[in-house]
Amino acid sequence: MTGTGLETLVTYNPPAVSLETTADRLLEMMERLHVQHLPVVDDGGRLLGIVSEMDVLLAVQRRQSVAAADEPLRAESVVAGVLATIGPEARPRQALKLLLDHGIHCLPVLSSGRLLGIVTTHDFLREFSYGEMPGSRDAVTGHLSPPVEPLEPDATLEAAEQAMQKCGQSHLAVVQGGCPIGLVSPIDIVRARCRQPAGPLRDADVETIRVSSAMRRIPALRPGQRLCEAAALMIEHQLPAAIVTNQANRFLGMLSENHLLGLMLRQLK
């Protein structure tokens, strides 16, 4: 990192929403901006909370399972309290530690309660992807854990959720014939369910959705590639992890965003 402060990492004056912003507008903004979180502020720019794509989609999903409401769903119904904030004078290590300790992906930067900016896990990954930090050019192969049992593409979404809970992972590879064809995470599952049209048979239709309809097809890494390349892949495809295969395209394991961020934390002072 070129500086000792957060200035090279923070997105200043980030897009923000109000409590009255509708769910449709929230989802449109998130898709257009390629983000999964938006800060909620009052008229004076004071931070009220954070709204996430996951929370919005879950609320939409609940509405689809019951009779349609007259009033549109708004941010005030899904806004979450802020687990942590930081000031503009903080050091990068403080911000990254807060993100990892709280298991969150975005950290508001405040001054006197007013929103100045946002720093995210992707901002730190991007810094790591430049390959200038110690360890960022290590080979992927030295950082692989024993692979978790992957999913088959014809598994149901419920089976995928159960598998994630059982192994304690928030993402799993989807493998066919020993070769990975994609990755699935909780947000992918919720997105797939919300794509189902409303109607009397919707709940039954949702239960038949297969992992192949929810997964993201992504390029795999080779064991000899560098960790900074893994970070770049995660940023480009907005992934929580990267899949690693051998030359025969056989599944070897996964490398998570949190693993790379943990390495980065140990290097920061």
Where do the language-model regions lie?
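Conserved active-site beta-strand-loop modules that form the wall/rim of enzyme catalytic pockets
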Residues: 170-171, 182, 186-187
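Short hydrophobic beta-strand segments in globular cytosolic domains
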Residues: 47-48, 110, 115-116, 175, ...
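Tandem CBS (Bateman) regulatory domains
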Residues: 1-13, 52-83, 96, 100, ...
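Intrinsically disordered, low-complexity regions enriched in small/polar residues
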Residues: 39-40, 130, 173, 253
